[in-house]
């Protein structure tokens, strides 16, 4: 389009799904493909040049399409909470973001405990989780109080208070999902007496997406595509997705 460097024509690119809003001076303002502007579930999409990142790899288009939301969300969470070589818990670990977080946290040298259903435990260990915890188990009983350095949460829900109980003093908690429920109970004493830090994570700096592309090009992560559908079967694809029978 007009204003785009002609040298970029023919590039293979990935487009950030969540983008900084050019209509706002607020650096935290964002817009999402398929929400604030058209392009989700579409054959073609108009994208800004500065939100289109070149990628050089032998992955298929379908494999690359699995990356922008799940892996950038996961990498953004890990960057926000500064995950390092430490013991962490990932909730909702068998979902798209959770399984991406396992691979990305492994690159950082973290020891990973993945919370999931029993039938998905072995697959998550193959991705890099050292241990798995049944999502229905009591985390305090299984892991113990003050047992992990950080929690990467995609679930929320009624068991949320246990996530702060298992954090060590000075621990960090980062969240970017609430599939089990967005309303939780917080005992402020756990927060201030243990000197915990809580992070929300949605808007990412461009370097987060650049990190993900570098991991792809260096062969450090692998795509997880369980099934693909033609665009006209999008309703069927969504129904299969909601069955949650795959990683």
Predicted regions and their residues:
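Glycine-rich beta-strand-centered segment in the early N-terminal region that forms part
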Residues: 1-22, 58-59
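Short glycine-centered segments of the SAM/dcSAM-binding site in methyltransferase folds
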Residues: 12, 87, 111, 171-172, ...
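N-terminal Rossmann-like NAD(P) cofactor-binding module of classical short-chain dehydrogenase/reductase
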Residues: 14, 149-152, 174
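Glycine-rich phosphate-binding loop and adjacent beta-alpha segment
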Residues: 29-30, 158-224
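A glycine-rich, Thr/Ser-enriched phosphate-binding loop motif common to dinucleotide/cofactor-binding enzymes
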Residues: 36-41, 57-80, 94, 100, ...
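C-terminal hydrophobic helical "lid"/dimerization subdomain
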Residues: 76, 206-247
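Conserved N-terminal Rossmann-fold NAD(P)-binding element of oxidoreductases
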Residues: 88-92, 176
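Adenosine-nucleotide cofactor-binding segment
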Residues: 90-91, 106-161
């Amino acid at each position: 389009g007009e204003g785009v460097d002609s040298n970029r024509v023919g590039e293979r690119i990935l487009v950030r799904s969540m983008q900084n809003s050019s209509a706002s001076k607020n650096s935290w303002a964002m817009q999402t493909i398929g929400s604030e502007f058209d392009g989700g579930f579409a054959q073609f999409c108009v994208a800004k040049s500065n939100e289109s990142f070149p990628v050089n790899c032998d992955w298929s288009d379908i494999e690359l399409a699995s990356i922008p939301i799940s892996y950038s969300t996961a990498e953004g969470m890990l960057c926000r909470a500064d995950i390092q070589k430490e013991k962490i818990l990932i909730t909702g670990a068998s979902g798209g973001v959770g399984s991406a977080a396992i691979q990305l946290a492994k690159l950082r040298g973290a020891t990973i405990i993945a919370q999931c259903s029993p039938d998905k435990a072995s697959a998550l260990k193959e991705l890099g989780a050292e241990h798995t915890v049944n999502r229905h188990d009591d985390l305090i009983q299984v892991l113990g109080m003050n047992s992990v350095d950080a929690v990467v949460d995609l679930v929320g829900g009624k068991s949320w208070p246990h996530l702060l109980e298992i954090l060590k003093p000075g621990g960090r908690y980062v969240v970017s999902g609430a599939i089990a429920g967005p309303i939780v109970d917080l005992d402020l004493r756990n927060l201030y007496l243990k000197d915990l830090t809580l992070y929300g994570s949605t808007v990412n700096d461009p370097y987060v997406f650049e990190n993900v592309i570098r991991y792809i090009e260096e062969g450090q992560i692998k795509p997880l595509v369980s099934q693909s559908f033609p665009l006209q079967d999008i309703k069927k694809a969504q129904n299969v997705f909601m069955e949650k029978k795959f990683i």
